[in-house]
Amino acid sequence: MRIIMFTPLSDAAKVLPATSFLDAHIECLPAVPSSYATAADADVVLLDARGDLVRARALCQLLTGPMSCGPVMLVLEEGGAAVVQADWGAADFVLAGATPAELSARLRLVRRVAQAPLPVDEDRIEVGDLVIDTTAYTARIRGSIIDLTYKEFE
């Protein structure tokens, strides 16, 4: 398993002590634009979010949005867990004081969920906010039904 951790520190064990018991090597990189491209081929990306939560949120959204890297797991202090929202794009989070067993289980689960194929619905066409259901003859934009005649739908 290839794990990358974005952190200003050079040792992952200083951020998350449980990493020293993992059988996978963790590559620590600074959170600078020149290192973001390496996250694309990582199985899991750990993001040190113990300090600057605003910057961590922006980086998490970048990695899971335009960068389209593997699943991102935030490393937080206990107080930071209250701030994290779904719009950050993180797959999971772990507290800095997590045990090796908890960290290992979370990494396995996050990786497994990321590898699960999404079901393909061949009767639905999605382009941005527009969703067309060819079997129900409906079209929606941002969730609102568009009133189309049969000819317009075709």
Question: Which role fits each region the language model picked out?
Answer:
Residues 1-4:
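Extreme N-terminal starter segment of soluble prokaryotic enzymes
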Residues 64, 68-126:
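Basic, amphipathic DNA-recognition helix from helix-turn-helix-like DNA-binding domains
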Residues 8-14, 23, 30-72, 76-83:
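Conserved phosphotransfer microenvironments
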Residues 22-28, 43, 89-95:
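Active-site regions of enzymes building and remodeling cell-envelope glycoconjugates
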Residues 7, 48, 95, 148:
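Small/polar loops that bind or transfer phosphate-bearing groups
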Residues 112-151:
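Short, Lys/Arg-enriched segments at the junction into DNA-binding effector domains
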